[in-house]
Amino acid sequence: MGLARALRRLSGALEPGNSRAGDEEEAGAGLCRNGWAPGPVAGSRRRGRFVKKDGHCNVRFVNLGGQGARYLSDLFTTCVDVRWRWMCLLFSCSFLASWLLFGLTFWLIASLHGDLAAPPPPAPCFSQVASFLAAFLFALETQTSIGYGVRSVTEECPAAVAAVVLQCIAGCVLDAFVVGAVMAKMAKPKKRNETLVFSENAVVALRDHRLCLMWRVGNLRRSHLVEAHVRAQLLQPRVTPEGEYIPLDHQDVDVGFDGGTDRIFLVSPITIVHEIDSASPLYELGRAELARADFELVVILEGMVEATAMTTQCRSSYLPGELLWGHRFEPVLFQRGSQYEVDYRHFHRTYEVPGTPVCSAKELDERAEQASHSPKSSFPGSLTAFCYENELALSCCQEEDEEEDTKEGTSAETPERAASPQALTPTLALTLPP
């Protein structure tokens, strides 16, 4: 009975028009050119973050065989990675175990020599050590070099001398391990990430006539991040042409590696730009498709801490709902007199750019190609359009001029000052066609 049922299933699977093959064809037809689905599968819930906004990875390891032995084999890294309370507890227990072990050793040596008898011998191994508590105190005083001057070792027992020498060596090794682990934990560049910030949202807007994905990074400290560079990856489930389902596929997002623009000089906040071209995983996504997409953009900032020369890595992520289509970041860098000023009040702020195309970059390229072959090509922008950055630059310039006029007691404004905006923002109000 069971064999017949299995044969029927096998024959049905070998038929050329079986339903499974049709399902695979339908699934393959719904994929983009890179094998990625344009949106979440119908009926499936949106997946959680793989990398949280604070940079922690939302990953939990289970069913690890021999996890404790593997961690103990790299004890120093384990001590550096654990929390401070567990680290202090571990080191306290280590010192206490060392004192107890050598205290027990000294007590056994004294007991075997007869120092604990009622009438003590005339030449004991340890002076003033007549109990286990006294032996424990002697071990404590020896390892910590307290030196009260009451208890001491004599030359009567070579074993006692050897035990004292061994404890001194073990104490030095333990002290070096503890000091090294504490210093390594204090100097970890992990805390440096607290002063490296990403913008809360990423934006999609036109830059140099191309749709670009942009986000902002900033350094809150005066100390620089040496050899700072950025990279990004797009995480999304993918189905291969062979039907293999990859739950979390990683694809690099180009942020200027070939041109060297991924290397940044992070003195003031910088906007990272990813040009959405034919090699971009976002090439076929418009505003509507982006809202329905199911992916996660992981952004990474790496560099060396100037004070310690240790490499640090700061991470964050953006979901499709955190990608603002048709927005730009407000400027944050201004010039005040002879100095430059960074106003972090505008760091996360964006403003909407009217006229941003809602189609995908692929459709935009196709339209541009058709317009190039057309005898009448209209310029998409308005010649009377004025940039928000220019307005903010001029307003800041006027505020600075008013402050200087108030200090100097003059109400007249010189033409040179009125014509020079003091904000480091794009000052071209018009964008001429190529």
Swiss-Prot record:
<dbReference type="InterPro" id="IPR013518">
    <property type="entry name" value="K_chnl_inward-rec_Kir_cyto"/>
</dbReference>
<keyword id="KW-0407">Ion channel</keyword>
<comment type="function">
    <text>Inward rectifier potassium channels are characterized by a greater tendency to allow potassium to flow into the cell rather than out of it. Their voltage dependence is regulated by the concentration of extracellular potassium; as external potassium is raised, the voltage range of the channel opening shifts to more positive voltages.</text>
</comment>
<feature type="transmembrane region" description="Helical; Name=M1">
    <location>
        <begin position="82"/>
        <end position="108"/>
    </location>
</feature>
<dbReference type="Pfam" id="PF01007">
    <property type="entry name" value="IRK"/>
</dbReference>
<dbReference type="InterPro" id="IPR040445">
    <property type="entry name" value="Kir_TM"/>
</dbReference>
<feature type="transmembrane region" description="Helical; Name=M2">
    <location>
        <begin position="158"/>
        <end position="185"/>
    </location>
</feature>
<feature type="topological domain" description="Extracellular">
    <location>
        <begin position="149"/>
        <end position="157"/>
    </location>
</feature>
<feature type="short sequence motif" description="Selectivity filter">
    <location>
        <begin position="145"/>
        <end position="150"/>
    </location>
</feature>
<dbReference type="GO" id="GO:0005242">
    <property type="term" value="F:inward rectifier potassium channel activity"/>
</dbReference>
<feature type="compositionally biased region" description="Low complexity">
    <location>
        <begin position="418"/>
        <end position="434"/>
    </location>
</feature>
<feature type="modified residue" description="S-nitrosocysteine">
    <location>
        <position position="79"/>
    </location>
</feature>
<comment type="similarity">
    <text>Belongs to the inward rectifier-type potassium channel (TC 1.A.2.1) family. KCNJ14 subfamily.</text>
</comment>
<dbReference type="InterPro" id="IPR014756">
    <property type="entry name" value="Ig_E-set"/>
</dbReference>
<feature type="topological domain" description="Cytoplasmic">
    <location>
        <begin position="1"/>
        <end position="81"/>
    </location>
</feature>
<keyword id="KW-0813">Transport</keyword>
<dbReference type="InterPro" id="IPR041647">
    <property type="entry name" value="IRK_C"/>
</dbReference>
<feature type="compositionally biased region" description="Basic and acidic residues">
    <location>
        <begin position="407"/>
        <end position="416"/>
    </location>
</feature>
<protein>
    <recommendedName>
        <fullName>ATP-sensitive inward rectifier potassium channel 14</fullName>
    </recommendedName>
</protein>
<keyword id="KW-0812">Transmembrane</keyword>
<dbReference type="InterPro" id="IPR016449">
    <property type="entry name" value="K_chnl_inward-rec_Kir"/>
</dbReference>
<feature type="intramembrane region" description="Helical; Pore-forming; Name=H5">
    <location>
        <begin position="132"/>
        <end position="148"/>
    </location>
</feature>
<keyword id="KW-0633">Potassium transport</keyword>
<keyword id="KW-1133">Transmembrane helix</keyword>
<keyword id="KW-0406">Ion transport</keyword>
<keyword id="KW-0702">S-nitrosylation</keyword>
<keyword id="KW-0630">Potassium</keyword>
<feature type="topological domain" description="Extracellular">
    <location>
        <begin position="109"/>
        <end position="131"/>
    </location>
</feature>
<keyword id="KW-0851">Voltage-gated channel</keyword>
<dbReference type="GO" id="GO:0034702">
    <property type="term" value="C:monoatomic ion channel complex"/>
</dbReference>
<feature type="region of interest" description="Disordered">
    <location>
        <begin position="398"/>
        <end position="434"/>
    </location>
</feature>
<keyword id="KW-0472">Membrane</keyword>
<feature type="topological domain" description="Cytoplasmic">
    <location>
        <begin position="186"/>
        <end position="434"/>
    </location>
</feature>
<dbReference type="Pfam" id="PF17655">
    <property type="entry name" value="IRK_C"/>
</dbReference>
